[in-house]
Each structure stands twice: as C-alpha cells, then as structure tokens.
C-alpha cells in the first residue's frame, strides 16, 4: 500500500514538468495562430483600403464573423447542454462502479486510482473547454460558406418558376443551398453531441464495454433516445429537402425530375417524412420507457423504409413500367430539361439561320468582303509565340506568357491583331543573380508589348510587327506612353517601389536604363510597424532589415491578375485568359468573370464543371501600372449578379461608365463559348422525340494535331455576316454531325457593339454535302504537289509545321478554307510562314502568300465567273499585235491590282485578258 502511494508522489515533479511543457506549447501555438490571423487581417485591411474596396473587406469580414459566431455559439450551446446533462446524470452513479467499469478493459488497474483522478478533475470547466474547442472547429469550417448565407439574405428574384413545384427559380439558386448547409450542420452538431455525451458517460461508468459485459445505464438510454429523436426530426426535414433535389437527378435519359421521380420518388419521400416523424416520436417516448427495442425499431423503420421506398421500388418501377414506354412517359420531363437547360446557359437566345452553302465565290465577292480576307489569321499561337520569344524577348528574364487575339482600328482599317505583354520573370536571371535585392527591389516590372497583324508577314516569312522593341516602337500600332507592367500574368511575388535605389527599367546596349515608380500602386511600408508586419506576413526579415526601404516606399502584393481579382471577389469565377488592351497610351488587363451556380433546376451540368448555370455578367479591368481594379456589370438581368450587387452595392460599376475605348475591346469569352457550344451539340434539338433518339447530335470537328487527332478549338475572326453591311469581330466554331466529318453548322458569338453577346448558328442544308475541316485536311494530304513539297522540305533538314486550326471562313453564303504552313530548322526555334494553303469547293492550292493562293484558287476552271455567251457571237477578226499588247497590258494591270489587294480590279482585268486570249485563240484556229 505504501509503495502504491509514494510512487506517484515521487513522479509528481516530473509529471508537473511535462504538464507545464504541454501548457507552454499550447500557449505558444495559440499565440502564433493569433499572430498569423492578426497579420492576415491587417495586411488585407491595408490592401483593400489602398485599392478602394474597404467596404468589400468589412462586409466580407463581417459576414464571416457573423457566421462564425452564430455557428460557434449554437454548436457550443448544444454541446455544453448535452455535456452538462451527461455529467449531471452520471454523478448519480457510485465512483467505485465507474472506476471498475472503465479500468476493467484496461487490465484491471486499481479502481481507487481512477476515482481519485476523476474526482479531482474540474468537469464543468473541462466540458466547457471541450465544447468550445469542438465548436471552434465546426465554426471555422462553416465560416467559409459566408457567401451562401449572404445570398440567402439578399437574394434577388429570378422572375420565372420551376414547372414542378412552381417555386421561383431564385429559391433554388439562393435558398436551397443555405437550407442544405443548415441541415448538414444540425446533423453534425447532433452527432458530435452524442459522442461528447458518450465520452462523459463512459468515463463515469454509465457505459460498460469489455469482453464480458456490454451495457449502458437507463440514463444513457434516455439521453441517447432524446438525441436520436432530434436526429430523426432533422432527417424528416432532410427528406423534405430531398424533394427539391429530385430536380438535379440523372437517370440516364433526362437530368431533373423524371416520370419515376414524380410518380414514385416524390410520394416515397412524403412517406419517409412521415416515417421519420414517427421514428422521432418513438425515440422521444423511449426517454420514459428506456429500452433498447424502441430506438432499434425506429432506426429499422427509417432504414428499411428508405431502402425500399427510395431505392428498390423506384428501380423496379422504372425497369418494368417506365422502360417499355419510356419516350411517351418521359416526354414532358425531357421537354422541361431541354427548356431549362437552354435557359440556364442562354442557349434559348441563339438565333438559328440557314446557310445556303452556294459556293458562288468570285473576285467580285472577295472584293466586297475585303475586310474578311485581310483578317484571315495566318499566324497560329505556338509558332508566333516561338517567333516572339526569339525576336522580342531580348533578355532571358523577359517572357511572353500568352498571346491574345484582339482588334484595333489602325490606319483607318479594322484589323485583327495578335498581342502579348513582355513581362518580367526574375527566376530566369542567372543563378548568381538570384538575390533578394534583384527579386524584390531592382527587377520589378516588365516593359511594353509586341503586336502583329494576323495576316501580314515579311519577305523572310516573319511576322510584321506593329509594336516591337524596348522601349516600345509603334510601326502602325497604337502608341504606348506608359510601358511598365507591374501587374500581369507572370507576377507572383511582392516588389518594393519608391525605394532608395532606382529600379531596372530596360537594357540599352551594354548598359541598363533605370527608373523610379511614379504611380499610386502598392501599400505604404515606410513606417517601422508596417515593415515589421509585412516581414512577419511574408516570413522575410529582409523587409525589416533592408536599407533600400525608405519612408516613401510602397510594397506591391497580389500582382497576379487572377489572384488580385479573386481576393476582392472570390464569388466570381474567372476566365482562363485575361488579355492585354492598349488604350490611350496605357496598358490594361481585361478579365472576364462569371456568375455561376450548380442549383439551377432541371438543367444539364456542364461537362467537367461543377455548374449548371453561368453568365458572363462582369468585365474586370486591371491597370498594368497602378494595379487599380474596376468591376463593370454587363448583364443587369442576371439574378446572381443582382444579388451580389445588393450585397456589395459599391463594387460594381455600370458598363456604360467604362471608358469608351476600352468598351471597344470587350470580346466574348472563350470559356463560356466552349461551355455553350458543348451543350448546344445536344440542346439545339428542341423536339423531345429527336432529343431522346439523339437523331441530330453534333460534335466539334476533328483535325490532325499532336501526332494524332485533336478537337478543333474556337477562334476569333473579323468577317461580315451574310446580309450585314460591315465586318465584325466574332468568336466562331464549326460543327459536324456525330461520328461524321462533313460540316453541318457553324456557331458564332458577336463581340462588337451594339450586338455584343448575341449568338448565331448558321445551319447548312442537310441534303447538301459541305466539307468539314477534317475532310479538307484529308484532301490537302492527298494533294501530290503539296505532299511532294512537304517531303522535300523535311528531307532538307527543315521541320514542317501545320497550322493548329484549319480556318473555316464564311464569305457570303460560301465557305473558304485556309491554313498556314511554317518551316523551322530541325534544331531551330524560329518558325517562318512559308506557304498558305487554301481550299474552295473541289480545289486545293498552296502558294507563298494568301493573295497568291486565292488568285490561283479562283483561276481554276469552274471557280471563276462564267464567261458571257455574247463572247461567242463577236465578229471574227484576225489576232493582231495590238491585241497581244492589250492582253499583256491587261495582265500587268491585273498583277498590280493583285498586289494592292484590289480583288474587284484584279477580276475585271483578268476577265478582260481572258476574253482577249480566247478571241486570239479562236482566230488562230480559224487560220
């Protein structure tokens, strides 16, 4: 007995030291966590204040705080209540019984020792601490859903009802997600309460669990029954919410509520609500009865009912009743799915028009569509990116991240151009130059941009550059007065500006040019307290120790376009491709942003996307020099955007106040267009019978690529639509029938005002064969002349590169096909545009330039305008020297017209020359 008592006493100092270390570690962890939270808060507050969105910051912080406190309080109260009840009831048991029951499973340790330890614990404080800690974890997770609850509170009506329950669609977009979160939290809180109480009962011996005995006291049964009843009550509500989730089901035929769901699934859910209510009442009744059988029966009632009513019966009903007459029974539900999917993605706004595919092109037609011809894109992304890198990166630390297609009015004409910003990547500096000063103080910004027309090339096959060099030189392109790029796609680290040393600006010969920042970007960091804050935030003591930082210095953070926009508006989904715009001598980034939801009723989810509703409601403009961010609301009819505008009334500006020059550069975003095009492959079919049988399913065209077969990507193009008076900027993509290669339609999105955002699909006659891109590629590969030339180049040590897309060019009611061909040395990295391949009708040609290709294409028999029959009735005369001279003169004039791009003049002179030559030929035969 003496040994058992004195042993622990001798170990007490060591145990106290261990406890002290544990407490110290916990205190340090808590302090470090609070410091990290405080630094994040202060940095965010400073940053939001500087860029002018302090109201957004406080609204977001306030919403997170309210959700956190509400969830923490509710969870803690529930856990505390159950913990204290368990403690109150458990103390009625004898301490000796408690000790014996617990320690019997641990090897029959002395029961008096456990009783001593248990009795010395301050259980109320321990329960309070445990409840608060568990609630903290739950609340921290739920605080991230602040946007869902704000949308619930500020929701805007959609203005249309779902056809099954007649609820406004806004209920599904804004209320249902909040209800599901609340339901899930209630289930979690009840489950944690049960575990929390069970732990207390176990320690106090109310629950016995060993190899000889498994039992629990009547008190535990009563408490557990009360919680089980609450769980069944929440489950009843969950089944009620499941009625609405039927609108998101997918049985393979239709997305949304099907015939089986409405006639079997919905009644089954009502029955499950009733059974769950009965189970809840039975569980609560067991608080007095205190038996195992009643809760077990309640649980089996719900479990078996759910399996039979929600699982087995619908499967049997679908298999033996619905499947034999599936189309007839599912017809109204297929029609709902078609209508609501088209509505969710704005597919119902696509205007369908016929395209005759007459193939009646002539020189006169080409001349009438000169803007289209002059903007056929011959420079593909990758070859042009390689060329830019070789010719214009100038130093290893400059990088062209991505090339973009845009349009500008240059020299009085509407031109499609490729443009890319010359950004700075300090990580590409030599290894011995990878210093903190270089990364954060000296090499702070990129410089200028490169721009080239999509069609023109030099005599060496290189792009003609409208913008080039450092500092930027404009040769036909827009002037850049402020070329420095502090914010872009490559910038992922902070920099210090307005320091004690000038920043590297650009290289000039053997020397460098330096400059000092003179803008408003960045957060002030001159004060010691702010230097300490950012040093802790970035875990970088150099910010505190560096002598380069002065009282006027500013630190630029979040310089990446995507990160910058997401930090301000995390509820917006961003397009993958922000693009550079030069306006009034300054450089801006234009970022498309989407409002999305995955709760639009009965709508097909987008492929590989967690959404079934999307709108391009917001355009974001970021100043490349100052980093200012402006959000412009494009779609005032979007209820999701309207809801966020209610939440953040000063975040969005009307699109009408966007500078007019920037408005001219908005374009239809490719990500949205792809989603819509993918869905339109099926959802252009509006008749339920046709949709069910997939009779008219479309797909994207195939084309050779990457050593195999790839899917054609959409492309931007300037062209004039049939019946329109002027050329416009479009995003377009051809379509082909499923498992076929002939073209069936082409989809286009208009990018210019006043018709921005309107989608048009031009459908070809089903009885007429129109070659698709893959078929034209096959014809190109079958051309002996082209194949021989490509083989010859490959044998001469050059690598032939085909264009990524064979461009389908609609002109009037005809289709022209164009693809470039590049040459690159076997071990070189400088592609040259060497040939242009053009196809029209049955003819395929390859020439050095587009003009020559079109000239050759339309001089083939059958492709030119037919010669007037009056030619044969002209009086016969002998060919003379004057006729030969006139024919030669006509030829020379035709060549001049061709070089100047005057297709109409070329056609006139060529036809006149042909008439002369035919006349001379006839008279020679007569002789």
UniProtKB/Swiss-Prot annotation:
Keywords: Cell membrane, Membrane, Transmembrane, Transmembrane helix. The chain crosses the membrane at residues 17-37, 65-85, 134-154, 185-205, 220-240, 264-284, 297-317. InterPro entries: UPF0182 (IPR005372). Its main location: membrane. Pfam families: UPF0182 (PF03699). It is a multi-pass membrane protein. One of its GO terms (cellular component) is plasma membrane. It is found in: Cell membrane. Belongs to the UPF0182 family. PANTHER family: UPF0182 PROTEIN SLL1060. This is UPF0182 protein bll7333. It comes from Bradyrhizobium diazoefficiens (strain JCM 10833 / BCRC 13528 / IAM 13628 / NBRC 14792 / USDA 110). The lineage of its organism: Bacteria, Pseudomonadati, Pseudomonadota, Alphaproteobacteria, Hyphomicrobiales.
